[in-house]
From Swiss-Prot:
Protein name: Uncharacterized ABC transporter ATP-binding protein YfiC
Domain ABC transmembrane type-1 residue range list: 49-332
Pfam assignment, any one: ABC_tran
Domain of life, source organism: Bacteria
Transmembrane segments: 50-70, 86-106, 172-192, 288-308, 510-530
Bilayer topology: Multi-pass membrane protein
Sequence similarity: Belongs to the ABC transporter superfamily.
Keyword tags: ATP-binding, Cell membrane, Membrane, Nucleotide-binding, Transmembrane, Transmembrane helix, Transport
Localisation per UniProt entry: Cell membrane
Gene Ontology BP, a term: transmembrane transport
Domain ABC transporter: start-end pairs: 366-600
PROSITE patterns (alphabetical): ABC_TM1F, ABC_TRANSPORTER_1, ABC_TRANSPORTER_2
SMART domains membership: AAA
Length: 604
């Protein structure tokens, strides 16, 4: 993921004007709305679409010419018992089928170009939009289910565009052209053939009314299953540690069975379409053969015309059959497209205030003024929180799980906005600053140190993309990471797998600290940065953090109190309220909650 990350990325041409994009693409809440929205993407390639339609018309016309010429040839050569002029007719047929084949090839080539370009745009727009969404959206979504929308659902749309659009256009043109030729040859036989259309339409409506919901349910169940698989793979160690293999398998089988059931009924009911169409097709052919034979005996129509008409009756029902078959894939693709558009319709992270300024943090002083916040309405996570951190000093937050410690950092980085109160940095309300300028001057070292797939050098350089190799190594030395990196077979060029599996949790943390060192932030956020670490590694991390915190305003969150004793201020939170505040020594002398917590940990 980090490969060539320093190279400038060329974004695809996406709608920059969000209001304009919203006007062009109405929200997809139904089938018609989704189709209109898909068309808005296709319409951007009108030139190629016109060429595709032209090729479809040519292939359909020449497809109709072939049987007509054959019918005339039967009357002339077989009924007339002569071979005079046979070669020109054969050459004519050869030319017809060559032109038809070439037009088919071009229409497929251009349609693939259109569909791949459209899907590229949709996928790019979806991925870009995902990273414009606020953190609360991701907190409420399963990552595997989101991945299913970016991959499976869009691929479903892609495969449908590749085949269905051409098939539908071709079927409509062939259907209209066939009826026109049939009317020219025999209006009476044409009327007899058309009697099956009401039966076809009624059958198709009955089936599609039932399969639409089933295909939507199938796509939903597929997303749920993908999310569960992603979760189980990510948590494989925990599953094995607690011997939950049987339980996880049982839950998987339950979700897999739900997908199987919805898929079974969607495919079974939609599978009736070709069966019904084929039966009606055979009925139509039988009627044409019987009635056409009687007409031929009476001399009302030639033998060649009967043969051609019978073939046209096949061609008449074939496009209807093809259209019916395309409903399966179309319904599935529409269901997938709706899931994609649901994400695209999610509101992006709240825009910066109109007068927000792009201003770097100068000193990093922090002030919370009567700040209250709740993730859910009616439930406050933080209540009237007030504190001040002078520039260059550190403040630590302690308290039981759910007290609101991490929420403080979420608000400080504007991942969430407070319900009440103000947060000031350098005396300026952070709402008046752009999020980009605010976060650019912050460094994060979190409990779960996320590393991207790529080399160690690339992961450290993520803190500052234009950093030289020497600066990367200097940052690693400051973070006490250089020695263990050098011991690896390929050193800084060691490739890490997803999320850094292959190195220890402590080593991941040291790389994360090196990344923060390289970023050179004014304000530092350490969220449980030394939890779940062995004692020796913790010493290295503590030394690295001490160097990193020097001269920087630092916000520390920790459960292990021995890691925050040197903090300038310690705030004790309980049920979202600040119940104690002071230095370590002051809080110990108070003999309150912090003192009891410290003594309990010290005794352990």
């Amino acid at each position: 993921m980090l490969k060539d990350i320093r190279k400038p990325f060329q974004y695809p041409k996406l709608p920059i004007d969000k209001k304009e994009g919203a006007k062009k693409r109405a929200k997809a809440k139904d089938t018609k709305g989704t189709l209109r929205r898909i068309w808005s993407y296709l319409a951007e390639r009108k030139g190629l679409l016109i060429l595709v339609m032209l090729m479809v018309v040519i292939s359909a016309i020449f497809g109709l010419l072939g049987p007509f010429v054959i019918g005339k040839a039967i009357d002339h050569f077989i009924v007339g018992k002569t071979v005079s002029g046979l070669i020109p007719v054969l050459l004519l047929l050869l030319a017809i089928y060559i032109i038809q084949s070439l037009s088919l090839w071009f229409q497929n080539y251009w349609m693939i170009t259109i569909s791949q370009g459209t899907v590229f745009r949709m996928r790019s727009e979806l991925f870009t939009h995902l990273h414009e969404l606020p953190i609360p959206f991701f907190d409420k979504q399963r990552h595997g289910e989101l991945m299913s929308r970016v991959t499976n659902d869009i691929e479903n749309v892609s495969s449908t565009l590749n085949t269905s659009v051409i098939q539908i256009l071709s079927s409509v043109i062939t259907f209209v052209g066939t009826i026109a030729v049939m009317l020219y040859m025999s209006p009476l036989l044409t009327l007899i053939t058309l009697t099956i259309i009401p039966v076809m339409a009624a059958s198709l409506k009955w089936i599609t009314n039932r399969t639409g919901k089933l295909f939507k349910e199938q796509q939903k169940n597929l997303g749920d299953l993908n999310g569960y698989i992603e979760e189980s793979v990510s948590g494989a160690k925990v599953i094995k540690a607690y011997s939950r293999e049987k339980q996880i398998t049982a839950e998987f089988l339950e979700k897999n069975a739900a997908l199987k059931t919805s898929g079974f009924w969607a495919q079974t009911i939609s599978g009736f379409i070709p069966k019904v169409m084929n039966s009606l097709n055979n009925l139509s052919f039988t009627m044409i053969a019987a009635i056409g034979g009687l007409f031929a005996l009476k001399g009302w129509i030639s033998i060649g015309s009967i043969v051609v008409f019978a073939e046209y009756s096949r061609q008449f029902t074939r496009p209807l059959n093809d259209l019916a078959n395309q409903f399966n894939t179309m319904l599935s693709a529409i269901a997938g497209a709706e899931r994609v558009f649901d994400v695209l319709d999610e509101k992006e992270e709240r825009e910066d205030e109109k007068n927000a300024v792009h201003q770097p943090i100068q000193t990093g002083s922090i002030e919370f003024r009567d700040v209250s916040f709740g993730y859910d309405k009616g439930q406050q996570t933080l209540k009237h929180l007030q504190f001040t951190v002078p520039a260059g000093q550190s403040i630590a937050f302690v308290g039981p799980t759910g007290a609101g410690k991490t929420t403080v950092t979420n608000l400080l980085a504007r991942f969430y906005e407070p319900n009440d109160g103000k947060i000031l940095i350098d005396g300026t309300d952070i709402k008046t600053l752009t999020r980009a300028s605010l976060r650019k001057n912050m460094g994060f070292v979190l409990q779960d140190s996320f590393l991207f797939q790529g080399t160690i050098r690339e992961n450290i350089r993520y803190g500052r993309l234009d950093a030289s190799d020497q600066e990367v190594e200097a940052a690693a030395k400051t973070a006490n990471a250089h020695s263990f990196i050098e011991r690896l077979p390929k050193g800084y060029d060691t490739v890490l797998t997803q999320n850094g599996s292959g190195i220890s949790q402590g080593q991941k943390q040291l790389i994360s600290i090196a990344r923060a060192v390289l970023a050179d932030p004014v304000l530092l956020i350490l969220d449980e940065a030394t939890s779940n670490i062995d004692t020796v590694t913790e010493v290295n991390i503590q030394e690295a953090l001490a160097r990193l915190m020097e001269g920087r305003t630092s916000v520390i969150i920790a459960h292990r109190l021995n890691t925050i004793q040197r903090a300038d201020q310690i705030v004790v939170l309980k049920n979202g309220e600040m119940i104690e505040k002071g230095s370590h020594d002051e809080l110990i002398r108070q003999k309150g909650f912090y003192s009891d917590l410290y003594e309990s940990q010290f005794e352990k």
